[in-house]
């Protein structure tokens, strides 16, 4: 326990909060270009082929981003919008691709949770 005199001499240092998505550089989203689109397998108790893309962002970072939803139209050189948000069972995947913007089309035949998958309201 420091004395008041010690605190006057040098104040307590604030603990700095480490960001969970440094590649976005404090922006809500970033634009990027897909350099590789592929599938990976998740960690131990789960089993699947998760669709991910390697994206070169405008901030200069190259990150791995998850492609949500069933089916996608992304390929190399597709321009995508990337947001933060990790995928718990894919190590190293800390970003999501926003569906329904730029070159990423919305999920086909989606009727529930449409706003999360870039789908317009059906007529």
UniProtKB/Swiss-Prot annotation:
Q: Which PROSITE patterns match?
A: RIBOSOMAL_S12
A GO cellular component term found in this entry reads: small ribosomal subunit
rRNA-binding in keyword set: yes
Q: Does the keyword Ribosomal protein apply?
A: yes
Keywords attached to this entry = Chloroplast, Plastid, Ribonucleoprotein, Ribosomal protein, RNA-binding, rRNA-binding
Matching Gene3D superfamilies: Nucleic acid-binding proteins
Q: Which GO terms describe its biological process?
A: translation
Where's it found, cell-wise? Answer: Plastid, Chloroplast
Q: Which GO terms describe its molecular function?
A: rRNA binding; structural constituent of ribosome
CDD domains xref list: Ribosomal_S12
Cross-referenced SUPFAM superfamilies, in alphabetical order? Nucleic acid-binding proteins
Question: What's the subunit arrangement here?
Answer: Part of the 30S ribosomal subunit.
**HAMAP family, per this entry?**
Ribosomal_uS12_B
Identify its protein family: Belongs to the universal ribosomal protein uS12 family.
What job does the chain carry out? With S4 and S5 plays an important role in translational accuracy. Located at the interface of the 30S and 50S subunits.
What is this protein identified as? Small ribosomal subunit protein uS12c
Q: Upper lineage ranks?
A: Eukaryota, Viridiplantae, Chlorophyta, core chlorophytes, Trebouxiophyceae
